UniProtKB/Swiss-Prot annotation:
Residues recorded with modification N6-succinyllysine: 13, 121, 317
Entries under PANTHER family matching the protein: FRUCTOSE-BISPHOSPHATE ALDOLASE
Modified residues (Phosphoserine): 36, 89, 132, 272, 276, 299, 301, 309
Catalytic reactions on record: beta-D-fructose 1,6-bisphosphate = D-glyceraldehyde 3-phosphate + dihydroxyacetone phosphate; beta-D-fructose 1-phosphate = D-glyceraldehyde + dihydroxyacetone phosphate
Positions marked as site (Necessary for preference for fructose 1,6-bisphosphate over fructose 1-phosphate): 364
Subunit architecture: Homotetramer. Interacts with BBS1, BBS2, BBS4 and BBS7. Forms a ternary complex with G6PD and TP53; this interaction is direct.
Gene source species: Pongo abelii
Note: In vertebrates, 3 forms of this ubiquitous glycolytic enzyme are found, aldolase A in muscle, aldolase B in liver and aldolase C in brain.
GO biological process, one term: gluconeogenesis
Signal peptide: none
Descriptive protein name: Fructose-bisphosphate aldolase B
Length: 364
């Protein structure tokens, strides 16, 4: 016989629900600016810019100081610990700049992968130790949501039942701890696109992973109305020779979600998974036009697919600030339109927006 002990007060539930809904309201999505120092270094290296704290700060200042109308397209920004405490050139905290624009501030909470012994190089995610204390401090510092990324891959004997269950339980425990501290948890069980599997195989695995995640969330008494999901779109592996249309990706993706994600979840914000900027937008638009029931807001939580053109336009030069902001705003508006099924591809995208952003075994 199951016994129920209240996990959250009505006031806590109300706050969490309102935060989650505000992030995805009216076609808004999320900018994932939570790249680690090492990952940001890889991005800067491609444009021949040194990976220093000042260069990282300068690029993010350009993004965050964009015109306030960005709040019509971006509802939340995920920050890395370093960025949460950085300031602009006038001494103003980035988090306060975002809040003044009406954008909700989030934080990356997982601490990377650890090997699962007895599996084919599978991992579970670290970061549960001390998580409650970190969440409490971040809440005091103005953070209202968190993000935790679990990584699963399709390969020989992968993902194993052990990896699926272990990562689902870690996600659920993280989500529960977040909510206890007033943070909306973004649940990110990512089936990465490495491999040569086809669309149907990815759909099958994605359904198994999401079903396990929501079983675990239920077991851990997580309040679904105060959460957001950040899944992969259902796509073929990067090395698959068969190509699929955005409409085929959309049908497989929405079918998988319809079978596994409760309607209580207010929003699903897709990761871009190394797609080009333009492909990520076209697929999101097709998903919102898919003729299947869609009880959730279907939006975006993009990092590379919102920043690639902006980074290329910047090139490490302060004189390129306006061009950088224009490139960022263009992608943000395009994805805002796609989140409402209203994006029209004009064919005038720059080279950076059509270049694949895939990185094998990608880590933040």
């Amino acid at each position: 016989m199951a016994h129920r002990f209240p996990a959250l007060t009505q006031e806590q539930k109300k706050e969490l629900s309102e935060i989650a809904q505000s992030i995805v309201a009216n076609g808004k999505g999320i900018l994932a600016a939570d790249e680690s120092v090492g990952t940001m270094g890889n991005r800067l290296q491609r444009i021949k810019v040194e990976n220093t704290e000042e260069n990282r700060r300068q690029f993010r200042e350009i993004l965050f100081s964009v015109d306030s109308s960005i709040n019509q397209s971006i509802g939340g920004v995920i920050l890395f610990h370093e960025t949460l405490y950085q300031k602009d050139s006038q001494g103003k905290l980035f988090r306060n700049i975002l809040k003044e624009k009406g954008i909700v501030v989030g934080i990356k909470l997982d601490q990377g992968g650890a090997p699962l012994a007895g599996t084919n190089k599978e991992t579970t995610i670290q970061g549960l130790d001390g998580l409650s204390e970190r969440c409490a401090q971040y809440k005091k510092d103005g953070v209202d949501f968190g993000k935790w990324r679990a990584v699963l891959r399709i390969a020989d004997q992968c993902p194993s039942s052990l990896a699926i269950q272990e990562n689902a339980n870690a996600l659920a425990r993280y989500a529960s701890i977040c909510q206890q501290n007033g943070l909306v948890p973004i649940v990110e069980p990512e089936v990465i696109p490495d491999g040569d599997h086809d669309l149907e195989h990815c759909q099958y695995v994605t359904e198994k992973v999401l079903a396990a995640a929501y079983k675990a969330l239920n077991d851990h008494h997580v309040y679904l109305e105060g959460t957001l999901l950040k899944p992969n779109m259902v796509t073929a592996g990067h090395a698959c020779t068969k190509k699929y249309t955005p409409e085929q990706v959309a049908m497989a993706t929405v079918t998988a979600l319809h079978r596994t994600v409760p309607a209580a979840v207010p929003g699903i914000c897709f990761l871009s998974g190394g797609m080009s900027e333009e492909d990520a937008t076209l697929n999101l638009n097709a998903i919102n036009l898919c003729p299947l029931p869609k009880p959730w807001k279907l939006s975006f939580s993009y990092g590379r697919a919102l920043q690639a053109s902006a980074l290329a336009a910047w090139g490490g030069k302060a004189a390129n600030k306006e061009a950088t902001q224009e490139a960022f705003m263009k992608r943000a508006v395009a994805n805002h339109q796609a989140a409402k099924g209203q994006y029209v591809h004009t064919g005038s995208s720059g080279a950076a927006s059509t270049q694949s952003l895939f990185t094998a075994c990608y880590t933040y």
